[in-house]
Design a protein with these regions (language model features):
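Alpha-helical transmembrane segments of multi-pass membrane proteins
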Residues: 21-29, 33, 146, 150
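Transmembrane alpha-helix/helix-exit interface in multi-pass inner-membrane proteins
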Residues: 30-52
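Short amphipathic alpha-helical coupling elements at transmembrane boundaries
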Residues: 7-18, 22, 57-62, 86, ...
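Internal alpha-helical transmembrane segments of multi-pass membrane proteins
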Residues: 93-108
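Short, small-residue-biased leader/transition segments that mark boundaries at the very start
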Residues: 2-5
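Alpha-helical transmembrane segments in multipass membrane proteins, preferentially the mid-helix core
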Residues: 80-91
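C-terminal transmembrane helix-loop-helix hairpin of multi-pass membrane proteins
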Residues: 109-163, 168-169
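Membrane-interface interhelical connector segments
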Residues: 44-71
Length: 170
C-alpha cells in the first residue's frame, strides 16, 4: 500500500499529507508486527545456546555499530530491490511468476546484506528482549532513522519517480 500511495502522490492523485499519514500508520503497524513476531520467536528458545542466537546477536550488534553512510547506502539499494520485487510481481501473469519475482527481489537484499527498516525492527526487538545481546535503544534508533531515510530515498528517487516519468511519456 505504501508504494502504491507514493506513486499516486507523485502523480498528484493523493495529497502528500495523506501519504505521510499512510507512511506513519504503515511504519507503526510494521513495528507492532515486528514486536509480536519477535516475541513469538523468543518463545522458541532458539536464542538459548543455538547458532541461530549467535547469528542474530552478532547481526544486531553489527547493525547498530555500522557507519552512517554504509547504512544509508545499503538501505537505498535494499528498497530498490524490494520495490522492484513488488512491481515485477505485479507485472507477472501467473501466481507462480508473482511468487518467484517476490522471492528473488527479497532474497537479493537479504543475501547482499542490505538494510531494511522493517526487517531491522524484528532483529532489534529480538536483540532487546535477549539479555545476551549488547544493543541499546539509542543504537536501535540510530539505525532505524538512517535506514528508514535510505529506504525512502531508494524507493522514491530510484524506483517510483523514474517509473512515473516513464509512464508520463506514454
Amino acid at each position: 500500500s505504501e508504494m502504491c500511495i507514493r506513486d499516486r502522490s507523485i502523480k498528484g492523485e493523493v495529497s502528500w499529507g495523506k501519504t505521510i499519514k499512510v507512511w506513519i500508520v504503515c511504519y507503526l503497524g510494521n513495528l507492532l508486527g515486528s514486536v509480536v513476531t519477535a516475541g513469538i520467536f523468543m518463545m522458541t528458545g532458539l536464542m538459548n545456546g543455538q547458532e541461530v542466537g549467535t547469528f542474530l546477536r552478532n547481526a544486531a550488534v553489527a547493525k547498530v555499530s555500522a557507519a552512517p553512510m554504509e547504512l544509508f547506502a545499503k538501505a537505498i539499494f535494499c528498497n530498490i530491490c524490494v520495490c522492484l520485487a513488488v512491481w515485477c510481481s505485479i507485472k507477472m501473469k501467473t501466481e507462480t511468476g508473482k511468487i518467484m519475482m517476490a522471492i528473488l527481489g527479497v532474497m537479493t537484499f537479504v543475501t547482499s546484506g542490505y538494510e531494511h527498516s522493517v526487517a531491522n525492527m524484528t532483529f532489534f526487538t529480538i536483540g532487546l528482549l535477549d539479555p545476551g545481546t549488547a544493543i541499546t535503544i539509542g543504537g536501535v534508533l540510530y539505525n532505524l532513522l538512517i535506514v528508514t531515510a535510505g529506504n525512502m530515498l531508494g524507493g522514491i528517487l530510484f524506483v517510483a519517480l523514474p517509473y512515473y516519468l516513464i509512464q508520463k511519456k506514454d
